[in-house]
Amino acid sequence: GWLKKIGKKIGRVGQHTRDATIQGLAVAQQAANVAATAR
């Protein structure tokens, strides 16, 4: 029923959040590498 629908929505949001977090970490890692190389 509607509970399952809401659960699916929350799951999708969680997936997006996780993807964004992983992407953000990757970008931060790259920036750290660039900073280390620039020194």
UniProtKB/Swiss-Prot annotation:
Supply the alphabetized keyword list: Antibiotic, Antimicrobial, Immunity, Innate immunity, Secreted
Cellular component GO terms, alphabetical:
extracellular space
GO terms, biological process: antibacterial humoral response; defense response to Gram-negative bacterium; defense response to Gram-positive bacterium; innate immune response
> Carries keyword Secreted?
yes
Upregulation: By bacterial infection.
The listed locations are: Secreted
Pfam family example for this protein?
Cecropin
The domain of life for this entry's organism is Eukaryota
What this chain does, per the entry, is described as: Antibacterial peptide active against Gram-negative bacterium E.coli. Has no activity against Gram-positive bacterium M.luteus. Weakly active against M.luteus.
Q: Which family does it belong to?
A: Belongs to the cecropin family.
Q: What is this protein called?
A: Cecropin
Which species is this record about?
Answer: Calliphora vicina
